[in-house]
Protein backbone atom coordinates (compact mmCIF):
# COMPACT_ATOMS: atom_id res chain seq x y z
CA UNK A 1 0.00 0.00 0.00
CA UNK A 2 1.11 3.51 -0.83
CA UNK A 3 -0.76 6.58 0.38
CA UNK A 4 -0.23 9.85 -1.49
CA UNK A 5 -0.64 13.32 0.01
CA UNK A 6 -0.57 16.87 -1.31
CA UNK A 7 2.23 19.16 -0.08
CA UNK A 8 1.62 22.33 1.94
CA UNK A 9 2.24 25.97 1.05
CA UNK A 10 3.11 26.71 4.68
CA UNK A 11 6.61 25.57 5.66
CA UNK A 12 8.43 25.21 8.98
CA UNK A 13 12.20 25.57 8.90
CA UNK A 14 12.38 26.97 12.43
CA UNK A 15 11.55 23.89 14.53
CA UNK A 16 14.56 21.55 14.76
CA UNK A 17 14.00 18.09 13.26
CA UNK A 18 13.65 15.40 15.93
CA UNK A 19 15.27 12.75 13.72
CA UNK A 20 18.66 12.91 12.04
CA UNK A 21 18.09 10.43 9.22
CA UNK A 22 17.26 11.76 5.77
CA UNK A 23 17.22 10.75 2.12
CA UNK A 24 17.76 12.56 -1.16
CA UNK A 25 14.84 13.46 -3.46
CA UNK A 26 14.63 11.40 -6.65
CA UNK A 27 13.87 14.15 -9.19
CA UNK A 28 16.61 16.69 -8.49
CA UNK A 29 17.52 17.04 -12.18
CA UNK A 30 13.88 17.76 -13.07
CA UNK A 31 13.57 20.25 -10.21
CA UNK A 32 16.77 21.96 -11.39
CA UNK A 33 15.21 22.39 -14.83
CA UNK A 34 12.14 24.04 -13.32
CA UNK A 35 14.25 26.27 -11.08
CA UNK A 36 16.20 27.46 -14.14
CA UNK A 37 12.92 28.63 -15.64
CA UNK A 38 11.67 30.18 -12.42
CA UNK A 39 14.89 32.17 -12.07
CA UNK A 40 14.01 34.01 -15.28
CA UNK A 41 10.95 35.53 -13.59
CA UNK A 42 10.92 38.86 -11.79
CA UNK A 43 9.18 39.19 -8.41
CA UNK A 44 6.26 40.85 -10.22
CA UNK A 45 6.11 37.97 -12.72
CA UNK A 46 5.95 35.53 -9.80
CA UNK A 47 3.21 37.54 -8.08
CA UNK A 48 1.12 37.50 -11.26
CA UNK A 49 1.77 33.84 -12.12
CA UNK A 50 0.95 32.56 -8.64
CA UNK A 51 -1.58 35.22 -7.63
CA UNK A 52 0.32 36.02 -4.45
CA UNK A 53 1.29 39.20 -2.60
CA UNK A 54 4.41 41.19 -3.46
CA UNK A 55 6.20 40.26 -0.20
CA UNK A 56 5.50 36.56 -0.81
CA UNK A 57 6.65 36.91 -4.41
CA UNK A 58 9.92 38.49 -3.27
CA UNK A 59 10.41 35.68 -0.74
CA UNK A 60 10.04 33.04 -3.42
CA UNK A 61 12.18 34.98 -5.89
CA UNK A 62 14.95 34.72 -3.28
CA UNK A 63 14.18 31.05 -2.63
CA UNK A 64 14.68 30.25 -6.31
CA UNK A 65 17.93 32.23 -6.33
CA UNK A 66 19.21 30.37 -3.27
CA UNK A 67 18.11 26.91 -4.40
CA UNK A 68 20.93 24.39 -4.86
CA UNK A 69 20.99 20.96 -6.54
CA UNK A 70 22.98 19.77 -3.53
CA UNK A 71 20.72 18.98 -0.57
CA UNK A 72 22.17 18.98 2.94
CA UNK A 73 20.73 19.43 6.45
CA UNK A 74 22.18 22.95 6.32
CA UNK A 75 19.93 24.09 3.45
CA UNK A 76 17.08 21.58 3.71
CA UNK A 77 14.75 19.70 6.05
CA UNK A 78 12.96 16.36 5.81
CA UNK A 79 9.82 16.94 3.73
CA UNK A 80 7.27 15.60 6.18
CA UNK A 81 8.74 17.81 8.93
CA UNK A 82 9.03 20.90 6.71
CA UNK A 83 5.44 20.91 5.42
CA UNK A 84 3.14 22.68 7.89
CA UNK A 85 -0.41 22.94 6.51
CA UNK A 86 -3.71 21.36 7.56
CA UNK A 87 -2.79 17.90 6.25
CA UNK A 88 0.47 17.91 8.18
CA UNK A 89 -1.17 19.10 11.38
CA UNK A 90 -3.28 15.96 11.11
CA UNK A 91 -0.29 13.77 10.27
CA UNK A 92 1.78 15.41 13.05
CA UNK A 93 5.09 13.86 11.97
CA UNK A 94 7.03 15.55 14.76
CA UNK A 95 5.32 13.26 17.28
CA UNK A 96 6.05 10.07 15.32
CA UNK A 97 8.86 7.80 16.44
CA UNK A 98 11.86 6.92 14.28
CA UNK A 99 10.27 3.50 13.68
CA UNK A 100 7.01 5.17 12.61
CA UNK A 101 8.88 7.43 10.19
CA UNK A 102 10.71 4.43 8.79
CA UNK A 103 7.34 2.81 8.04
CA UNK A 104 6.10 6.08 6.56
CA UNK A 105 9.17 6.16 4.34
CA UNK A 106 8.01 2.91 2.77
CA UNK A 107 4.31 3.74 2.49
CA UNK A 108 3.73 7.52 2.28
CA UNK A 109 4.48 9.74 -0.72
CA UNK A 110 4.00 13.48 -1.26
CA UNK A 111 3.18 14.90 -4.69
CA UNK A 112 4.97 18.16 -5.48
CA UNK A 113 4.94 20.70 -8.29
CA UNK A 114 8.71 21.22 -8.00
CA UNK A 115 9.96 17.87 -6.70
CA UNK A 116 7.52 15.52 -8.41
CA UNK A 117 7.31 12.78 -5.80
CA UNK A 118 8.81 12.88 -2.32
CA UNK A 119 9.34 10.35 0.43
CA UNK A 120 8.76 11.64 3.97
CA UNK A 121 12.46 11.85 4.83
CA UNK A 122 13.61 13.30 1.51
CA UNK A 123 15.35 16.63 2.06
CA UNK A 124 13.36 19.64 0.94
CA UNK A 125 14.58 23.15 0.21
CA UNK A 126 11.92 25.84 0.70
CA UNK A 127 9.84 26.65 -2.36
CA UNK A 128 6.41 27.53 -3.64
CA UNK A 129 5.15 25.98 -6.86
CA UNK A 130 1.67 24.53 -6.82
CA UNK A 131 0.95 21.72 -9.25
CA UNK A 132 -1.90 23.66 -10.86
CA UNK A 133 0.29 26.68 -11.69
CA UNK A 134 0.19 27.41 -15.43
CA UNK A 135 3.95 27.75 -15.64
CA UNK A 136 5.10 27.29 -19.24
CA UNK A 137 8.30 25.26 -19.33
CA UNK A 138 10.60 23.29 -21.60
CA UNK A 139 8.13 20.38 -21.74
CA UNK A 140 4.82 22.14 -22.20
CA UNK A 141 2.29 24.71 -21.06
CA UNK A 142 2.05 23.67 -17.40
CA UNK A 143 3.40 21.36 -14.70
CA UNK A 144 1.15 18.48 -15.70
CA UNK A 145 2.86 18.54 -19.09
CA UNK A 146 6.26 18.86 -17.42
CA UNK A 147 5.82 15.80 -15.22
CA UNK A 148 3.97 13.75 -17.84
CA UNK A 149 3.97 10.13 -16.70
CA UNK A 150 7.15 10.41 -14.61
CA UNK A 151 5.32 10.48 -11.29
CA UNK A 152 3.13 7.55 -12.31
CA UNK A 153 6.15 5.50 -13.39
CA UNK A 154 7.88 6.22 -10.08
CA UNK A 155 4.79 5.09 -8.17
CA UNK A 156 4.61 1.94 -10.28
CA UNK A 157 8.20 1.03 -9.42
CA UNK A 158 7.22 1.09 -5.77
CA UNK A 159 3.77 -0.51 -6.16
CA UNK A 160 5.21 -3.42 -8.12
CA UNK A 161 7.14 -4.54 -5.03
CA UNK A 162 3.82 -5.07 -3.21
CA UNK A 163 1.80 -8.28 -3.45
CA UNK A 164 -1.90 -9.12 -3.38
CA UNK A 165 -4.26 -6.75 -1.61
CA UNK A 166 -1.35 -4.59 -0.46
CA UNK A 167 -0.75 -3.44 -4.05
CA UNK A 168 -3.08 -0.45 -3.88
CA UNK A 169 -2.74 3.33 -4.00
CA UNK A 170 -4.65 5.32 -1.38
CA UNK A 171 -5.37 8.79 -2.74
CA UNK A 172 -5.36 11.33 0.08
CA UNK A 173 -4.22 14.13 -2.23
CA UNK A 174 -6.29 17.00 -3.59
CA UNK A 175 -7.78 16.90 -7.08
CA UNK A 176 -5.18 19.46 -8.23
CA UNK A 177 -2.30 17.22 -7.21
CA UNK A 178 -3.75 13.84 -8.09
CA UNK A 179 -4.15 15.07 -11.69
CA UNK A 180 -0.36 14.56 -11.91
CA UNK A 181 -0.97 10.81 -11.54
CA UNK A 182 -2.36 8.78 -14.44
CA UNK A 183 -4.62 6.10 -12.89
CA UNK A 184 -5.01 4.21 -16.19
CA UNK A 185 -1.24 3.64 -16.25
CA UNK A 186 -0.97 2.65 -12.58
CA UNK A 187 -0.05 -0.92 -11.70
CA UNK A 188 -2.63 -0.91 -8.90
CA UNK A 189 -6.21 0.12 -8.13
CA UNK A 190 -6.88 3.49 -6.49
CA UNK A 191 -8.99 4.01 -3.38
CA UNK A 192 -9.94 7.59 -2.47
CA UNK A 193 -11.02 8.32 1.11
CA UNK A 194 -13.66 11.07 1.31
CA UNK A 195 -14.35 12.90 4.57
CA UNK A 196 -17.71 14.57 5.12
CA UNK A 197 -19.09 16.60 8.01
CA UNK A 198 -22.74 17.23 8.85
CA UNK A 199 -23.63 20.85 8.18
CA UNK A 200 -26.79 22.62 7.11
CA UNK A 201 -28.89 19.50 7.22
CA UNK A 202 -26.62 17.31 5.09
CA UNK A 203 -23.19 15.75 4.86
CA UNK A 204 -20.67 17.75 2.85
CA UNK A 205 -16.92 18.05 2.36
CA UNK A 206 -15.56 20.97 4.38
CA UNK A 207 -12.11 21.75 3.02
CA UNK A 208 -10.26 22.48 6.27
CA UNK A 209 -11.65 19.40 8.02
CA UNK A 210 -11.11 17.17 4.98
CA UNK A 211 -7.46 18.22 4.66
CA UNK A 212 -6.78 17.51 8.32
CA UNK A 213 -8.57 14.16 8.04
CA UNK A 214 -6.34 13.11 5.12
CA UNK A 215 -3.35 13.68 7.37
CA UNK A 216 -5.03 11.74 10.16
CA UNK A 217 -5.63 8.85 7.75
CA UNK A 218 -1.95 8.80 6.77
CA UNK A 219 -1.00 8.79 10.46
CA UNK A 220 -3.46 5.94 11.09
CA UNK A 221 -1.81 3.89 8.36
CA UNK A 222 1.63 4.52 9.82
CA UNK A 223 0.85 3.99 13.49
CA UNK A 224 -1.13 0.81 12.85
CA UNK A 225 1.24 -0.55 10.18
CA UNK A 226 -1.67 -1.00 7.80
CA UNK A 227 -0.86 -2.79 4.57
CA UNK A 228 -4.28 -3.73 3.16
CA UNK A 229 -7.18 -1.39 2.33
CA UNK A 230 -9.95 -3.19 4.21
CA UNK A 231 -8.24 -2.23 7.46
CA UNK A 232 -8.82 1.44 6.59
CA UNK A 233 -12.52 0.94 7.21
CA UNK A 234 -11.82 0.83 10.96
CA UNK A 235 -10.47 4.42 10.88
CA UNK A 236 -12.35 6.39 13.53
CA UNK A 237 -10.14 9.31 14.51
CA UNK A 238 -11.65 12.61 15.72
CA UNK A 239 -15.22 11.36 15.36
CA UNK A 240 -15.17 10.09 11.77
CA UNK A 241 -16.69 6.68 10.98
CA UNK A 242 -16.74 4.60 7.81
CA UNK A 243 -20.10 4.68 6.02
CA UNK A 244 -20.43 1.43 4.08
CA UNK A 245 -23.69 2.47 2.39
CA UNK A 246 -22.12 5.63 0.93
CA UNK A 247 -18.89 3.86 -0.10
CA UNK A 248 -17.82 1.60 -2.95
CA UNK A 249 -14.68 -0.29 -3.98
CA UNK A 250 -12.89 2.87 -5.12
CA UNK A 251 -14.28 5.46 -2.69
CA UNK A 252 -14.29 5.06 1.08
CA UNK A 253 -16.61 7.61 2.70
CA UNK A 254 -16.14 8.67 6.32
CA UNK A 255 -18.73 10.83 8.01
CA UNK A 256 -18.83 12.86 11.19
CA UNK A 257 -21.82 14.43 12.89
CA UNK A 258 -21.01 16.74 15.78
CA UNK A 259 -24.08 18.38 17.26
CA UNK A 260 -26.87 19.65 15.05
UniProtKB/Swiss-Prot annotation:
Q: Record's InterPro entries?
A: YaaA (IPR005583)
Gene Ontology BP terms: response to hydroperoxide
Q: Name one GO cellular component term.
A: cytosol
Q: Which PANTHER family match?
A: PEROXIDE STRESS RESISTANCE PROTEIN YAAA, PEROXIDE STRESS RESPONSE PROTEIN YAAA
What protein family does this chain belong to?
A: Belongs to the UPF0246 family.
How is this protein named in the record? UPF0246 protein Bmul_1054/BMULJ_02209
